[in-house]
Amino acid sequence: MSLKSWHPQSKTKRVGASEGNPQWGSGSMEAPLLSSFLPPLASEAELTGNTWFLHRCSCILNLEESMDSDWGAWWGVSLPRRAPFLIYGSDGPWCTQAGFPGWGH
C-alpha cells in the first residue's frame, strides 16, 4: 500500500491501489485523514508491514449504527461502540463502522 499526498482542503489522504483487491480499483478511493491519530513513531514502512494498526477514523457515518461486539472480541481489543476505526494492514485500511472486511464509504 502506498500513501500518496493528501489535500488539506478535503482532509483526506489518497491511498494507492492494492494489487489483487478490486475494491481499491484505480486507487481513487480516499481514506479519512489519520495523521493526527497515528502513533508518533509510525512510519510508512510500519504501515505497509504485516503489523495491524488500530486508529480512530475521522469519517462521519451514521452514529446510530453500533459496532458488533463480537468483532472486537475476535481481535482481542476493546472497541468503543459507535466509534468508527480504521484497521491498517498489508492489504490496506478498512473501516470497522462499514463492516469488515470492506470499505463501504
Swiss-Prot record:
Residues 1-27 are annotated as: Disordered. This is Putative uncharacterized protein BAALC-AS2.
